[in-house]
Amino acid sequence: MSNVGKPRTAQEIQQDWDTNPRWNGITRDYTADQVADLQGSVIEEHTLARRGSEILWDAVTQEGDGYINALGALTGNQAVQQVRAGLKAVYLSGWQVAGDANLSGHTYPDQSLYPANSVPSVVRRINNALLRSDEIARTEGDTSVDNWVVPIVADGEAGFGGALNVYELQKAMIAAGAAGTHWEDQLASEKKCGHLGGKVLIPTQQHIRTLNSARLAADVANTPTVVIARTDAEAATLITSDVDERDQPFITGERTAEGYYHVKNGLEPCIARAKSYAPYADMIWMETGTPDLELAKKFAEGVRSEFPDQLLSYNCSPSFNWSAHLEADEIAKFQKELGAMGFKFQFITLAGFHSLNYGMFDLAYGYAREGMTSFVDLQNREFKAAEERGFTAVKHQREVGAGYFDQIATTVDPNSSTTALKGSTEEGQFHN
């Protein structure tokens, strides 16, 4: 019988946990025997998830003040342009999936209203686009990008339910090829964007269960998925229960009509929660309301006073009015200073949404008033970017693989007379 897909034994799993530096400082509230029992007799290979996780982990654990930064993408082609331009990771936010890329086909606010398998679907779409670009580049002998299939960090939201929902969602993320996932400590049924009001926290222990479930799914799948814990305690004013003694110092005693408890928000509960999450998370993210380096520093120092090697993440959010808070020179060095504090993964959650919407509005505004002049201005900027910065999508037929599939056709039939790119307007007007 073939050994392909053979599951690991409990002894092999335990040895990996005990000897692999990847798991230094990580706590699991389950045993290797339990993981082995859950595997089944055949384990699928998750090449993209494993490879991406390893690349991401290597990037965020490099020595010094370096960091990896990413932009939120909501389409495959946006991710391709990010990698072509030089970024080394892609971020996928639930907000953008809710707004314009979910499987229901509707536009939603960031309140977990869309089908739960939507984010894994977009992860798969982005990976497919990156794989296609890699294939195109390889057939053309284009080595300008050293790694097309970069890690994708995807939004698990509040898990869309309890621990079992988290487990299944994490499995779907891994199958789609996500390198990392993040999970927030809000009540899933009341989930809100981190920059909206009305957020309801869950007890600290309940979120530890979420993180434990996400890790378990990765262990069963045999992938070193990067698990990121997010806390919304800086702004949230409600919590479901007073059952966890770690939350009790922040509970005011007041109740709402729904039965929720009022809590004191701010830096202190964020640090307390982060310390509780640290043994279960590879990275920790505190959602904030402004781009505040001093707040970030206090958070990092508070967490690292007990967990000195804890890696951190930071949302450089479009919900901040950056120029209203910081001068140009402060903005220019913002990410570098965060990196020095230990914020090793930094991302702009809604970059794709803003780029897509403003880009089309700007073109349409000009087109409505100037006709073809507006589009030709765009095309000329594309030509200039192609000449000076390596932009390739001005050759749109080539960008989506017309030449690549021509090569497949001529491999099957060297005498094929029906190839697509040869004789096209693109070949005649753009390939010179």
From Swiss-Prot:
Pathway in which the depicted protein is active: Carbohydrate metabolism; glyoxylate cycle; (S)-malate from isocitrate: step 1/2
Pfam families: ICL
Residues reported to bind Mg(2+): D155
Cofactor note: Divalent metal cations. Mn(2+) or Co(2+) can be used.
Activity-regulation annotation: Inhibited by 3-phosphoglycerate, 6-phosphogluconate, phosphoenolpyruvate (PEP), fructose 1,6-bisphosphate, glycolate, oxalate, and itaconate.
Induction per the UniProt record: Activated by RamA and repressed by RamB.
Description of the deletion phenotype: Cells lacking this gene are unable to grow on acetate as carbon source.
Gene Ontology terms, MF aspect: isocitrate lyase activity; metal ion binding
Catalytic residues (positions): C193
Compositional bias ranges of the Polar residues kind: 11-22
pH influence on activity: Optimum pH is 7.3.
Enzyme class: lyase
InterPro entries: ICL/PEPM, Isocitrate_lyase, Isocitrate_lyase_ph_CS, Pyrv/PenolPyrv_kinase-like_dom, Pyrv_kinase-like_dom_sf
Entry keyword set: Cobalt, Glyoxylate bypass, Lyase, Magnesium, Manganese, Metal-binding, Tricarboxylic acid cycle
Catalyzed reactions per annotation: D-threo-isocitrate = glyoxylate + succinate
Function: Involved in the metabolic adaptation in response to environmental changes. Catalyzes the reversible formation of succinate and glyoxylate from isocitrate, a key step of the glyoxylate cycle, which operates as an anaplerotic route for replenishing the tricarboxylic acid cycle during growth on fatty acid substrates.
NCBIfam families in alphabetical order: isocit_lyase, PRK15063.1
PANTHER family registered for this protein in UniProt: BIFUNCTIONAL GLYOXYLATE CYCLE PROTEIN, ISOCITRATE LYASE/MALATE SYNTHASE
UniProt record similarity statement: Belongs to the isocitrate lyase/PEP mutase superfamily. Isocitrate lyase family.
Protein name: Isocitrate lyase
Organism name: Corynebacterium glutamicum (strain ATCC 13032 / DSM 20300 / JCM 1318 / BCRC 11384 / CCUG 27702 / LMG 3730 / NBRC 12168 / NCIMB 10025 / NRRL B-2784 / 534)
Taxonomic placement: Bacteria, Bacillati, Actinomycetota, Actinomycetes, Mycobacteriales
